[in-house]
Amino acid sequence: MYGIEYTTVLTFLISVILLNYILKSLTRIMDFIIYRFLFVIVILLPLLSAQNYGINLPITGSMDTPYINSTQGEVFLTSTLCLYYPTEAATEINDNSWKDTLSQLFLTKGWPTGSVYFKDYTDIASFSVDPQLYCDYNLVMMKYDATLQLDMSELADLILNEWLCNPMDITLYYYQQTDEANKWISMGSSCTIKVCPLNTQTLGIGCLTTDTNTFEEVATAEKLAITDVVDGVNHKLSVTTNTCTIRNCKKLGPRENVAVIQVGGSDILDITADPTTAPQTERMMRVNWKKWWQVFYTIVDYVNQIVQAMSKRSRSLNSAAFYYRV
């Protein structure tokens, strides 16, 4: 009986000793592997070069600041630049190779061939319906027209800011705007917008909810309409939905990879919605030349200074989805 107990104890002790030996052996092996691995890394580290990925901090500035006409050493090897211009520019220039000429001139400012894209649009109204800004930097040229001044302001407000939009079902619901950043944006071939403010009993204030003819008309046959009403008040809307789409939008902040270049006009467009604040002139500038060749030459000269007032963004603007922050 005692022999069996002694044997059991002895077996247990031997097992503990063997386990301890095995663990120590494994520890030595792991230490050897780890130290050898670290040694190899230390030896190879000076021979390796890794890509450093950093945060692209926004660069802001005012286009009213006087800029120096200069060629800078900074080369935008990984950036793309889009120039949006009215078709009348190409018609006036009347040169099949004018884009190649400008590409060579942009090369002297550090923009490689193939990094600058030229996109035309028919007029402000058609561009308003489907503005698609996909480049790292986007310069939109608008020729000033006194009869289209308000349309130009609305388009500038749309493309110079980021908007988060949601669908509106005006047949079922009343809507109200919560603050100054909340707007209703309508797009289409013809947008006529009428509103009827409601009191707490959902009765029309100065209008009849059952008669759209009594509604206040805030936009008539527009292709782009940004509607601003009294905040905190419910409204019933009437929209030409067969030719227009309306969305409830929130202005998130500036879209800093877009700049507007106004061609001609006595004053720079002011897109400030709140009349109590200073005019918003950032990323907006004016070029006063009669000929489009001179306009493009000026843009080439100052392109790097203009870009410095912008910030490269990965998000694009695609109005087809009507979701402006993509």
UniProtKB/Swiss-Prot annotation:
Binding positions for Ca(2+) 2 per the UniProt entry: 177, 228-229, 231, 301
Chain positions covered by the region annotation CNP motif: 165-167
Keyword Nucleotide-binding: no
Keyword set, alphabetical order: Calcium, Capsid protein, Disulfide bond, Glycoprotein, Host endoplasmic reticulum, Host-virus interaction, Metal-binding, Outer capsid protein, Signal, T=13 icosahedral capsid protein, Virion
Disulfide bonds, paired cysteine numbers: 82-135, 165-249, 191-244, 196-207
Positions annotated as glycosylated: 69
Pfam families: VP7
Subcellular location: Virion; Host endoplasmic reticulum lumen
Residues annotated as signal peptide: 1-50
Positions with a binding annotation for Ca(2+) 1: 95, 206, 214, 216
Location, primary (coarse class): virion
PTM comment, free text: N-glycosylated. The N-terminus is blocked possibly by pyroglutamic acid.
Highest taxon of source: Viruses
InterPro entries from the UniProt entry: VP7, VP7_1, VP7_2
Remarks, miscellaneous: Some rotavirus strains are neuraminidase-sensitive and require sialic acid to attach to the cell surface. Some rotavirus strains are integrin-dependent. Some rotavirus strains depend on ganglioside for their entry into the host cell. Hsp70 also seems to be involved in the entry of some strains.
Similarity remark: Belongs to the rotavirus VP7 family.
Subunit-level organization: Homotrimer; disulfide-linked. 2 Ca(2+) ions bound at each subunit interface in the trimer hold the trimer together. Interacts with the intermediate capsid protein VP6. Interacts with the outer capsid protein VP5*.
The protein's role, per its UniProt record: Calcium-binding protein that interacts with rotavirus cell receptors once the initial attachment by VP4 has been achieved. Rotavirus attachment and entry into the host cell probably involves multiple sequential contacts between the outer capsid proteins VP4 and VP7, and the cell receptors. Following entry into the host cell, low intracellular or intravesicular Ca(2+) concentration probably causes the calcium-stabilized VP7 trimers to dissociate from the virion. This step is probably necessary for the membrane-disrupting entry step and the release of VP4, which is locked onto the virion by VP7.
Name of this protein: Outer capsid glycoprotein VP7
Native organism: Rotavirus A (isolate RVA/Pig/Australia/CRW-8/1987/G3P9[7]) (RV-A)
